[in-house]
From Swiss-Prot:
Cofactor remark from the record: Binds 2 Zn(2+) or Co(2+) ions per subunit.
Active-site feature positions: 69, 134 (proton acceptor)
Residues binding Zn(2+) 2, per UniProt: 100, 135, 349
GO biological process: diaminopimelate biosynthetic process; L-arginine biosynthetic process; lysine biosynthetic process via diaminopimelate
Highest taxon listed in the record's lineage: Bacteria
Pfam families, A to Z: M20_dimer, Peptidase_M20
Cofactor(s) needed for function: Zn(2+); Co(2+)
Identification of the protein by name: Succinyl-diaminopimelate desuccinylase
Enzyme Commission number(s) from the entry: 3.5.1.18
Entry keywords, A to Z: Amino-acid biosynthesis, Cobalt, Diaminopimelate biosynthesis, Hydrolase, Lysine biosynthesis, Metal-binding, Zinc
Pathway annotation: Amino-acid biosynthesis; L-lysine biosynthesis via DAP pathway; LL-2,6-diaminopimelate from (S)-tetrahydrodipicolinate (succinylase route): step 3/3
Entries under InterPro entries matching the protein: ArgE/DapE_CS, Bact_exopeptidase_dim_dom, DapE_proteobac, Peptidase_M20, Peptidase_M20_dimer, Peptidase_M20A
Amino acid sequence: MSDTTLELAKRIIACASVTPEDAGCMDILIERLKPLGFSIEFINRNGVTNLWARRGTTAPLFVFAGHTDVVPTGPLDKWTSPPFAPEIRDGVLYGRGTADMKSSVAASVTAVEAFVAANPQHPGSLAFLLTSDEEGDANDGTIAVVEALKARGETLDFCIIGEPTSVDTLGDMVKNGRRGSLSGVLTVKGIQCHIAYPEKGRNPIHEAAPALAELAATEWDQGNEYYQPTTWQISNIHGGTGATNVVPGSVDIKFNFRFSTASTPEGLQQRLSAILEKHKLDYEIKWTLGARPFLTGRGPLADAATTAIREICGIETELSTTGGTSDGRFIAEICRQMLEIGPVNATSHKIDECIAVDALPKLSAIYRRILEQLMTA
């Protein structure tokens, strides 16, 4: 390897790749992958840079997936050092993307370099799926690559996404799935009138309140071995004209389900509508299914990750499905086994985002050890 994981991470962190820009990150990575025999394919869409790089043509196919884009920096004067000028202070590397998730991308590349050097004739194939559209709308990123791979009948046997999954120390948590996300905009209709004469109208906020209370108190399911119970939360309520003397004619309530495999989107929609009907509301709902839940149970990939973390970090990892959605929701459609394994998440998206320097070689070693268990004869 010409660079350590730290040096490669610093090079791509220095690229100001605010979503949906790649800002040269993938060019740096391609420089490292081509000498290893990776074929390079861009599956770009609507200005988004998407890379599919593959070494080998046979099964099993092991993929490292991730993103090179980062969230905006926020106020530059709040940063202790410039966000795109990576700096080490007291054993910690600072810069936008250090945790989410350029360090993981660098670690996956150096892990593959080391693995291929030691196992040049390894069975199966290795690949990288990288996008510059994960932190934004994600309409033209990983999903575009998945659609292209699906169209030509490709299936991923194993996939690791380098999202920052650890909580307190590297390796203490691995995501083996994610909950689904189902959002809705509920419009409850009333009759606008002068607030001094409420009998001449119908206040939709008052009418909706009992139903909302019941929805908030409903147990949607009890979860299961891998998932916490489904939750329902209101995110926004808007009603009225802004005047203090007008009963509003309607109220809009935005809400979200984070749901487990113990429920289905269709079942949740039906149950919610039944509660609204019980309260005799005049309403409309617009639904958006953001993601279905996905899960990798115990098996070769989870066992390999558990072993690797035990050997490298000296701890037992926890398999978890908590947290928000990720690009795994797209990859799951064509992947048999998938995990998210990455650094501590505490500073992701924050001012002075950072990662412990000693976590970088360890993360690379974890990735390499997983490859050694699954991709050697």
